[in-house]
Amino acid sequence: MADQSNNMIIEEVNKGLNPGTIVLLVVATLLILFFVGNYALYMYAQKTLPPRKKKPVSKKKLKREKLKQGVSAPGE
């Protein structure tokens, strides 16, 4: 390309990384580290924590379930 003074405009070759690329790499790296860390904590918790206790089923719910199945509830 030539401008008005007949000088050639030389496009500079971009050496190094684009700032947008650097930001993208940093964000992607942080996301990957976050998910890997969460997975590691999850696996550690699965090995070390005792299993969760189930909530006790209320007598009212037991009675309702037995009535649905056709079995008479005790005391009736």
From Swiss-Prot:
Keywords: DNA-binding, Nucleus, Repressor, Transcription, Transcription regulation. One of its GO terms (molecular function) is DNA binding. A motif (Nuclear localization signal) lies at residues 50-55. It comes from the Eukaryota. GO terms for biological process: regulation of DNA-templated transcription. Disulfide bonds: none annotated. The keyword Transcription applies. Residues 52-76 are annotated as: Disordered. Signal peptide: none annotated. Residues 52-66 have a biased composition (Basic residues). It is found in: Nucleus. GO terms for cellular component: nucleus. PANTHER family: DNA-BINDING PROTEIN S1FA1-RELATED, DNA-BINDING PROTEIN S1FA2. Belongs to the S1FA transcription factor family. DNA-binding protein that specifically recognizes a negative element (S1F) within the RPS1 promoter. This is DNA-binding protein S1FA1. The gene is S1FA1.
